Structure formats: structure tokens, C-alpha cells
Amino acid sequence: MTTLNTGSARISIMNGSSVASTSPSVKCKEDQGLNGHEEKENPFAEYMWMENEEDFNRQVEEELQEQDFLDRCFQEMLDEEDQDWFIPARDLPQAVGHLQQQLNGLSVGDSHESEDILSKSNLNPDAKEFVPGVKY
């Protein structure tokens, strides 16, 4: 297939027959590069990063390290905030165990001991109840 450009018309000759095209905005595949790029455009532009592959790798690695650092910072902030809040599932079992130990140490006294305390008391049983700020 041979293509001839004559001003605004393009003529394609195929096996002795000719087809005329007058639309200047439509370009045929021969005017474009192998993968759809125009002749003026570099067909290898999408692969130019490989020219400086070490710089590209370093940049990507820095971005990954930065993202990892940010993730660790956020996790540390969340952990610190978690410690400041009361979470029953985490905090209650320890507190309940401590209270259970304290309750086990208590004993119920019999009524004779309370009578002994009252008989040894120096307080006046007929005195009025003390109320702070009230003068009698």
C-alpha cells in the first residue's frame, strides 16, 4: 500500500486501484508510530524512566519508607490514645481480680465485738448529731 499526500487530499494506491481521502484531520496508521504515537512524539516516552532506573528505584523506595513511617506514627498515636481510655475488656479483668483479693481479706465480725466497742467508747450517746457550719 502506498500513500501520497497532496495538500489536503491523501491518495492511497492498493493493487493498482486508488482511493481518495479529503479529510485532513484523519491520519492513517503509517503517519503514526508503532504504538499509536505521532512521528514527532518519542515512541519510547513511556520507557524513559528506565534511563534513570536507579533514581526511579530510589524515589519509589523513599516513598515506600515514608508511607511505612507514617503508618507506624499513626499506629503509635492510636496505641497511646488507647491507653488513655478506659476499655472494660482490657481494664476490668485486672481491676476485678484486685477487688476480689481485697474482698477475700475482709471478714464479717460478730455482734459481740461491736458491743464491746460501744461499751469502751468515751463518746456521749445523747449528744446531738454534728453538722458542720451549724452553731448550737
Swiss-Prot record:
The lineage of its organism: Eukaryota, Metazoa, Chordata, Craniata, Vertebrata. Ubiquitinated in vitro. Expressed at very high levels in pancreas, at high levels in testis and at moderately high levels in brain, heart and lung (at protein level). Transmembrane segments: none annotated. Inhibits translation of capped and polyadenylated mRNAs by displacing PABPC1 from the poly(A) tail. PANTHER family: POLYADENYLATE-BINDING PROTEIN-INTERACTING PROTEIN 2 (PTHR13154), POLYADENYLATE-BINDING PROTEIN-INTERACTING PROTEIN 2B (PTHR13154:SF5). GO terms for biological process: negative regulation of translation; negative regulation of translational initiation. Residues 27-40 have a biased composition (Basic and acidic residues). The keyword Ubl conjugation applies. One of its GO terms (molecular function) is poly(A) binding. Interacts (via central acidic portion and C-terminus) with PABPC1 (via the second and third RRM domains and the C-terminus). Residues 15-25 have a biased composition (Polar residues). Keywords: Repressor, Translation regulation, Ubl conjugation. It comes from the Eukaryota. Residues 15-40, 107-136 are annotated as: Disordered. Belongs to the PAIP2 family. This is Polyadenylate-binding protein-interacting protein 2B.
